[in-house]
Amino acid sequence: DDRSHILAIWPSVASHGADYGGEALYRLFLSNPQTKTYFPNFDFHKDSPQIKAHGKKVVDALTEASKHLDNINGALSKLFDLHAFELRVDPGNFPLLAHHINVTIAVMFPDDKFDIAHHQLDKFLAAVGGSLTSKYR
């Protein structure tokens, strides 16, 4: 069951939000430099406090989504509005970030628990990204 796999692995991710989220953002910025344009004053070095702080925000939002798997849109509506209407983030960036979150979690959890949950985690991140991009229509 997708839900049980997400609920099993996500608390381990959430408890390291700044580290894992920061690592995912660092990988995103390194691999996709065009995404840096939304953060003009950031220090983009690996252990930057700014990257870790924003990474924690990302993981915290995903933690909230994991608690509301039946209503991700409702749970994160204000955040989605912010990204779509105020920040005007290119919706093509969300799948890129989801990929780097997946890679980071795979690196941090090289055991079987993640192997089983990888597909479900990918679907979860795609659902969150899909909900985010729905605001752009």
UniProtKB/Swiss-Prot annotation:
Red blood cells. PANTHER family: HEMOGLOBIN FAMILY MEMBER, HEMOGLOBIN SUBUNIT ALPHA. O2 binds at H54. GO terms for cellular component: blood microparticle; haptoglobin-hemoglobin complex; hemoglobin complex. GO terms for molecular function: haptoglobin binding; heme binding; metal ion binding; organic acid binding; oxygen binding; oxygen carrier activity; peroxidase activity. This is Hemoglobin subunit alpha-2. Keywords: Acetylation, Heme, Iron, Metal-binding, Oxygen transport, Transport. Belongs to the globin family. One of its GO terms (biological process) is hydrogen peroxide catabolic process. It comes from Telmatobius peruvianus (Andean frog). The N-terminus of the mature protein is acetylated. Residues 1-137 form the Globin domain. InterPro entries: Globin (IPR000971), Globin-like_sf (IPR009050), Globin/Proto (IPR012292), Hemoglobin_a-typ (IPR002338), Hemoglobin_oxygen_transport (IPR050056). The keyword Cell inner membrane does not apply. Heme b binds at H83.
